[in-house]
């Protein structure tokens, strides 16, 4: 068992669940709701209603892809590594390093997601060395 990859999977799955579940009570109401309340949107107009639904869909699809990626990392943590698996995990490590960097830069450190994504990235990278 690769503890680093399993750790990355647990952190990433937690991010995904928190992003969707907690967002239903706080984040979506505080962020997505505000965006959809801008005067750009007219709730009586069908296209604006569709835009609101798409914003909400994108929010939850993001959570779904993180949970799916966590499942892949958890699976890989329990199988024998091949060269292909190592390359895939290294790619994921870079992707989550970019998640961390963009989150840190764009929100200027005011949202803690950058640290969680950095943990996923580092654990994934270390996981490729532990095979």
Regions found by a protein language model. Give the residues of each.
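Membrane-helix boundary connector in multi-pass membrane proteins
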Residues: 79-81, 98-116, 126-131
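N-terminal signal-anchor transmembrane alpha helix
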Residues: 2-26
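Core segments of transmembrane alpha-helices
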Residues: 59-73, 117-121
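Cytosolic, membrane-interface loops and tails of multi-pass inner-membrane proteins
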Residues: 25-54
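Alpha-helical transmembrane segments and their membrane-interface exit regions
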Residues: 14, 36, 98, 121-128
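Transmembrane alpha-helical segments of integral membrane proteins
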Residues: 70-76, 94-103
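Polytopic alpha-helical membrane-helix bundles and their juxtamembrane interface segments
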Residues: 3, 17, 29-32, 121-126
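Structural signature of hydrophobic alpha-helical transmembrane segments
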Residues: 81-94
